[in-house]
């Protein structure tokens, strides 16, 4: 029986306050299986806070977060990851003094239940090595396999981090501003790479750059002052007058 289109991630009347200041104010949103869902909003909209609520960095003040129908509100990040949610960070989160292949190997080993140890010939684990090779090819990093992760270009580092997140074979992948700090060419490269490596997968992309979301995603939600202002197909959201006024500006009208 096909599971396409069923809810993978659900936010139900989600609230988050710090002290007496409300940041997230009643967000309800659904990400469905196979969907590429983009979340955009101006600076200060609450995007990072919402992202951290979903990934377990923060516990909600009120409301619920469901992953495949089970509540993950307030669950530690490592347990959320085990349940099938993987994320990349706005700032690269790699092992800079290890090679590209070693970074991927650690991610693959963790997914298959192996521990990284100096006393075990992990490179000889055929399944792990095969998966590492597959990811290197998908990420277009075969020629960089033995280079230190810290020596990669910034766009290559982001590609590697996304690959490490995908190596856990998640139910849903969360990307936090994957093109932040990139030139136009680097951004185009990373967007195309994300499109290729996440084909058929469920994706939630948090972005400030609306062009990235409109180019990559098939569903878009707009967060303004901690509330969902609009949600739907990218072309519908782009044409929404409220969105133009709140986020895109009159020049987008």
Feature locations, PLM:
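Glycine-rich phosphate-binding loops of nucleotide-dependent enzymes
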Residues: 2-253
